[in-house]
């Protein structure tokens, strides 16, 4: 029983959920899927040196393939902190709707961890499974902007357009750093491998042939080629 609890908290909950959560709102070490918990791959990373060193050790003089990995994205806790501000703001201002968002956050996150009962050594990262939970936290990030606006109104004793404009400008740092850090590893320009594979499949068969492929990953390119590009609809 103790081993099962240890596996649940340390692997299923911490490694396979909270690590993904921190990827999105704190930062990510690399886009390399780790094996056997290798400390140089796939962890969360904030960009704040002393915090990262507590968890990952010294971050100086790293090999080029680690230090310059395009998936190495650091947000300095800014999205997380703005979301936390929004969470507290909604809890104080609107507890009823807070409970709705909180239930969405829990049911699409921690509850799914329990439901799926993730096995060790997954073939790929499973962060996409918990996207609903991350969306819920993004609601709090949005409400965090309102909290900053109210703080500016309280500090300046002025209402009107100045406070929301100032709050928007200040909080644009968050989407700004997300865009700046993620653009290079999320840019899909000139990545045509999936489309090319589907095209090759379809061009290799006789008219009106039946194509038998391997699972969903091979099916999606075929659908795209046929339904969007109009390649070999026969």
Where are the regions a protein language model picked out?
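Lumenal/periplasmic acceptor-binding loop at the mouth of the active site in multi-pass
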Residues: 1-85
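Signature aromatic-anchored transmembrane alpha helix within multi-pass, membrane-resident enzymes
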Residues: 95, 143-179
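Membrane-interface catalytic loops of GT-C/OST-like multi-pass glycosylation enzymes that act
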Residues: 72, 94-98, 114-131, 187
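Membrane-interface helix-loop-helix junctions at transmembrane boundaries of multi-pass membrane enzymes
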Residues: 84-103
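Hydrophobic/aromatic-rich transmembrane helices and adjacent perimembrane loops
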Residues: 122-146
């Amino acid at each position: 029983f103790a081993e099962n609890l240890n596996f649940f908290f340390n692997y299923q909950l911490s490694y396979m959920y909270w690590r993904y959560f921190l990827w999105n709102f704190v930062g990510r070490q690399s886009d390399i899927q780790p094996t056997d918990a290798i400390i140089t791959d796939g962890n969360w990373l904030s960009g704040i040196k002393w915090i990262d060193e507590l968890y990952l050790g010294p971050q100086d003089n790293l090999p080029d393939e680690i230090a310059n990995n395009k998936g190495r994205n650091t947000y300095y806790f800014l999205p997380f902190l703005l979301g936390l501000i929004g969470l507290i703001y909604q809890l104080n201002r609107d507890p009823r709707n807070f409970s709705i968002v909180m239930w969405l956050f829990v049911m699409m996150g921690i509850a799914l961890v329990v439901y799926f009962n993730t096995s060790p050594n997954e073939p790929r990262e499973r962060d996409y499974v918990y996207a609903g939970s991350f969306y819920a936290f993004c609601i709090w990030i949005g409400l965090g902007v309102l909290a900053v606006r109210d703080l500016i109104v309280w500090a300046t004793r002025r209402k009107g357009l100045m406070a929301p404009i100032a709050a928007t400008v200040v909080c644009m740092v968050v989407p700004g750093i997300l865009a700046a850090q993620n653009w290079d590893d999320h840019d899909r320009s000139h990545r045509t491998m999936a489309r090319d594979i589907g095209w090759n499949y379809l061009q290799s068969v006789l008219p009106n042939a039946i194509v038998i492929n391997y699972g969903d990953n091979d099916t999606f390119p075929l659908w795209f080629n046929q339904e969007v590009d109009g390649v070999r609809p026969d």
